[in-house]
Each structure stands twice: as structure tokens, then as C-alpha cells.
Amino acid sequence: MTVFPALPGPLEIEAMKQYEASLRQARCKVALLATPEIKLPGTGAWDYLLISASHARSLPPYALLGMASRTVVVAKDVHSHNDRDWVLNNACTLSTSEFLQSRQNTGKKADMSRIKLLEMLALVADDADTGKLEAIFRQEPKLSYSLLRLVNSAAIAPRNPITSFAQAINLLGRRQLQRWLQLLVYADPNNSQRPNPLLQKAAARGRQLELLAPHLSPHPQVECLEDAAFMVGTFSLLDALLNMSTKEILQQLPLAPVVNDALAEHAGGLGKLLRAIEAAEAGELKQAASTMKALGITSDIYCDAQLASYSWAAKIRPTA
């Protein structure tokens, strides 16, 4: 799919028209990026219409319903759960996922199963013995089931299924176990058949930081840099998941100072790298590019890491 702007620059109009015509002739999918300054096209004029949630909500009633009869409507800049519910109930087939990173004011307490997982992560970080870890799983049997489903996913694809927590430790080792526990925080222990989009997002962000961290300049003097980077990435979405402030979460997690500072204040090389990735995800590309350049990371390195991390995260689909 190729996306065309509704308001191309004066010098680009003719070239855009020719390119659009060539794509249509080749029967390629074409999309229009809507803007409030320009009237919406007729239905069926484009294969896809990309429209911001705020623009969509300003339209007359049923405008999107008519458009959606022959055009796939995709909502973007969907920053709240309320916006997401609205666009999906008003003819938008797809939406972008900015809302995932917003905290909901639901009044609900944090999920205790996930709090238990945070306790377990602290024990793993302190190299606690296996018995203490198994004790937490005995208290929360859903966690044991969720962990086994996750470690048997396509991302690991063990030759023989992993069927017990002790087996998971023996086969994965403490280092890999800690990584899967970090991701398990995002799995839904109450509805294991429903994927949590935050799981894939946290996995991709963690993997991306891990791949980029060795290229930081100056190189951080951090023990197990890649592990620290992965943790910064995966834990950077805990506030949205747990509906708690980052400060509250960090008070319960005895993390290494470099990880704590990166999450709390975007401090140090890992913190700045996290800020750059967050800026890129938010579409603030100039800020992201400037920060990456200051950190010594080229656009090629960034793109390679991004593609590799998305590919890896897409394989994390818990088995039934």
C-alpha cells in the first residue's frame, strides 16, 4: 500500500499524479492521508483512507459509514482508549495503537498476578534459589500456565515441549528465564486466549534496545549491557500495563541503577536511547534522528534493529 498526502507541495503535484496513475494501472493498493483542510474524497476513490481520530470525530454523522462502504477506513493518532472505542464503532476497520501507552483512569487496582511477577523478577535479579521462585508460582498457578505457554511459543520453539517450571529453568537458564518473566508480565493470566498487544510492543522495544545498545557512543560501562537494555525496553511500558506511575513501580523493583535511572529520568545512554525510540514511535522523527545521531547510531543500524526486533516479537504467540 502506498499512501499519498491530501496536500502535496506545488512542485510535487504532477509527479504524484503520474506515480498514482502508474500504481493504479498496476493494480496496487493506494491510500489517501486525509486532512481537515481538504474535503474527503468520494467513497471508492481510494482503497484506503487514513484519518486522524480527532478529524474523524469532527465529521458529520454517518460520513465515515458512507466512506467505509467501498473504502477501508484506518484511524491514526488514536491516543486514548475512548478514541479507540469510538473509531471502531464508527466504521474504522483498523487503528494505530498510541492508546496502548496511555494509562486508564478506571479506578481498578493493579493486577495482583502481575505484582507477584514483579516480586519474582526481583528474586531472579538477586539470584534467588529455585525453591523461592517456585513458591510464587504455587501461589499463582495461572502464572505457571502462562509462562509455559509463552516459553513454548514460536520465538523459542523448543524441540520438546517445556512442561514444568524447573524444566524451564534448566533449559533456558537464569538469563533467558528473566527475559521471559519480563514479557510474561504483559500476558493476560485471566484470559490466556486473548493476545495483549502490549506484549508484542514491549518485546519489540526490548529487543530493539538490546540490538542498538552495543552501538552506543560513548560505549556505556555497564555490566551485561544487552540484558540491561532489554529490561529498559520491556519495562518502559509497565506504567500503561499496571495503571501505576513509573515512580510507584520502581519503588517495588530493586533494579540496577543504570536501568532505574533510564526508566525514571531517561538518564544515561540507555535512557537517551529509550527517549529516541519513544520519539520515533510518536512520529517525532526529527527529534529521534537528532538523538540517534548524538548517540552514534546511524539510520541503517537503527532500521536493521527495528526490522529484526519486529520480526522477533511477531513470533511471540503463546501456544494453546
Predicted regions and their residues:
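Bacterial c-di-GMP phosphodiesterase EAL domain
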Residues: M1-I38, K201
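Hydrophobic faces of well-ordered beta-strands that scaffold small-molecule active sites
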Residues: M1-P5, C28-L33, D47-I51, T71-K76, ...
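Proline-rich intrinsically disordered, low-complexity coils
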Residues: P5-P10, P36, P41, P60-P61, ...
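Glycine-/small-residue-rich active-site loops that bind phosphorylated ligands and cofactors
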Residues: P8-L11, A56, H79
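Bacterial c-di-GMP phosphodiesterase catalytic domain signature
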Residues: K17, E37-P61, S69, Q104-G107
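Generic structural signal for hydrophobic
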Residues: S22-L23, P41-T43, V87
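Short, acidic/polar
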Residues: T35-P41, H79-R84
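Conserved alpha-helical "signature site"
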Residues: S58-A320
